[in-house]
């Protein structure tokens, strides 16, 4: 049955270029979307730049630019990188938009009218040297929960807890290096504890991975707290209605950007109805891909806002781990990262897509990028086992049979084994168990190569009586290659495109069970090349940008 699906990725922050850690999520979601589209579902894929906050304001000031000009340049940079990695968003937008301003204020008025917003004076961290209230990411100290040092002012990367910056132990301003003072300010709070019963029921409904539910249970036991949705001037963002010096916290307007980005897409597509996807009891499905560091926001704050404002909640949230290199999490704010554009200068997008897919599962585990393992994985799996399968037999079809496949499969049992394996791969891709799907693909590629080794088609060319057998064997191998590449099409779109040109067909999931017979193929050309040692030097320590 055809489903109508909306898929989102968490929004990259618009204060610098994307690194390969960002692309773990974009690639994971893009593979899943491409797979679902190949299965015949209607899928809409959206994302946007998270374009508000003090860090953006300060960065633009340092560059002597307006925040609007700065985020415009960053937007173009992000879009360019995403396109080079074949991330096919139907709409990539920005939270600094008229639609987002509209929905943010509309939702705020609904919350306020329902008595879910309260105001009170609180103490905030203030840098007396720079004369500015410190945003969460511009103050560091020890986590108030687990006491880990060097944590930001909103969230601990070790224990996953969220907290107020004033709770940090021994806070230090990242702007001046001084200890900030406490300064009183009027702030606006959303009544998150009111939704605890709903949230407990919702998180147990299968919308999240088991390990996430376990973590949420810990947070429930600690007790939910009111959520500060306001920030003080100076700030780059949307004003709270009626207050010129108060702004909405970026973590309120950013998730609402999922709604506004889809609304903007609807204005571009006449056949797309906004409420079909976002009304309370929508029959459409909503899948959201996020990193483990923003689970608190997406599994507690976000569904509560949706419930209160009468919008639908996600069908499922896929949570992934971080990307590490040399055991360290890639971090744009810390400057230890490999920029996406640097990857493209040295390598190709398919190679990173495949490498991530070979490691991604439904478990929330960090993925280590190891240069030598990466080189081995691509050369061994993709070049030696998959691409080589086509190159081993294609010349026989090109030279002896006028580029035309035969009328029969030599080993029907082997072909059927590949076809029946599709159900397992479908299940793995559906559940984001990409590593298991890739393992099955490589296992079957090994079997296909063993078939070639056993049949030795090169020996059959010596006697014309073997012509039909040779023809059938090569046809069988290219059909097995076709099935392998159909499975890999969502993972490696460039290789799939080259394979389609060679096979002279469009790789369709529905056609896996139908042998390609009496069919003209093209002259074989190298579908991709091996990766050389010199190409991975930028992945080694001391070469990061």
Swiss-Prot record:
This is Methionine--tRNA ligase. Binds 1 zinc ion per subunit. Its EC number is 6.1.1.10. Belongs to the class-I aminoacyl-tRNA synthetase family. MetG type 1 subfamily. A motif ('HIGH' region) lies at residues 12-22. Monomer. Zn(2+) binds at residues 143, 146, 156, 159. NCBIfam families: metG, PRK00133.1. Disulfide bonds: none annotated. It comes from Buchnera aphidicola subsp. Baizongia pistaciae (strain Bp). It catalyses: tRNA(Met) + L-methionine + ATP = L-methionyl-tRNA(Met) + AMP + diphosphate. ATP binds at residue 332. Its main location: cytoplasm. A motif ('KMSKS' region) lies at residues 329-333. CDD domains: Anticodon_Ia_Met.
């Amino acid at each position: 049955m055809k489903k109508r699906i909306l898929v989102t990725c968490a929004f990259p922050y618009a204060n610098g270029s994307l690194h390969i850690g960002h692309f773990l999520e974009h690639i994971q979601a893009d593979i899943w979307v491409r797979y679902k589209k190949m299965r015949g579902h209607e899928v809409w894929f959206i994302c946007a730049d998270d374009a508000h906050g003090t860090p953006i304001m300060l960065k633009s000031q340092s560059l002597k630019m307006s925040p609007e000009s700065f985020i415009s340049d960053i937007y173009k940079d992000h879009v360019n990188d995403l396109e080079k990695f074949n991330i096919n968003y139907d709409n990539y937008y920005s939270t600094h938009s008229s639609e987002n301003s509209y929905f943010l204020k509309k939702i705020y008025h609904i919350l306020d009218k329902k008595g879910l917003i309260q105001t009170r004076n609180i103490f905030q961290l203030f840098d007396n040297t720079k004369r500015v209230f410190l945003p969460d990411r511009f103050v560091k100290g020890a986590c108030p929960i687990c006491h880990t040092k060097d944590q930001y002012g909103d969230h601990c990367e070790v224990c996953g807890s969220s907290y107020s910056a004033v709770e940090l132990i021994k806070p230090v301003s990242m702007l001046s290096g001084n200890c900030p003072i406490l300064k009183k300010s009027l702030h606006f709070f959303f009544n998150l504890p009111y939704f605890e019963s709903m949230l407990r029921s919702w998180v147990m409904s299968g919308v999240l991975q088991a390990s996430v539910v376990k973590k949420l249970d810990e947070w429930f036991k600690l007790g939910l707290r009111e959520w500060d949705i306001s920030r003080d001037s100076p700030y780059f963002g949307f004003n709270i209605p009626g207050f010129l010096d108060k702004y909405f916290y970026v973590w309120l307007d950013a998730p609402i950007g999922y709604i506004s980005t889809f609304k903007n897409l609807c204005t571009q597509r006449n056949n797309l109805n906004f409420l079909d996807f976002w009304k309370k009891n929508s029959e459409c499905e909503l899948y959201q891909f996020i990193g483990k560091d923003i689970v608190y926001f997406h599994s507690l704050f976000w569904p509560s806002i949706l419930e209160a404002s009468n919008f639908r909640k996600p069908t499922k949230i896929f949570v992934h781990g971080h990307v590490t290199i040399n055991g360290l999490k890639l971090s744009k704010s810390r400057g230890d990262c490999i920029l996406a554009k640097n990857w493209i200068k040295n390598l190709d997008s398919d190679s990173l897509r495949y490498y991530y897919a070979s490691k991604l599962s439904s478990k929330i585990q960090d993925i280590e990028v190891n240069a030598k393992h990466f080189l081995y994985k691509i050369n061994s799996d993709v070049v030696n086992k998959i691409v080589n399968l086509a190159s081993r037999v294609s010349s026989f079809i090109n030279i002896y049979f006028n580029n035309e496949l035969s009328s029969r499969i030599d080993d029907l049992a082997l072909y059927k084994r590949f076809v029946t394996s599709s159900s397992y791969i479908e299940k793995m891709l559906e559940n984001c168990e990409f590593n298991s799907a890739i393992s099955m693909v490589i296992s079957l590629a090994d079997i296909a190569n063993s078939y070639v080794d056993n049949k030795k088609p090169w020996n059959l060319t010596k006697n014309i009586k073997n012509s039909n057998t040779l023809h059938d064997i090569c046809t069988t191998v290219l059909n097995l290659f076709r099935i392998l590449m159909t499975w890999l099409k969502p993972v490696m779109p460039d290789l799939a495109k080259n394979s389609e040109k060679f096979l002279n067909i469009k790789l369709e999931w529905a056609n896996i069970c139908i042998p390609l017979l009496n069919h003209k193929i093209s002259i074989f050309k190298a579908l991709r090349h091996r990766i050389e040692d010199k190409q991975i030097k930028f992945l080694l320590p001391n070469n990061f940008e």
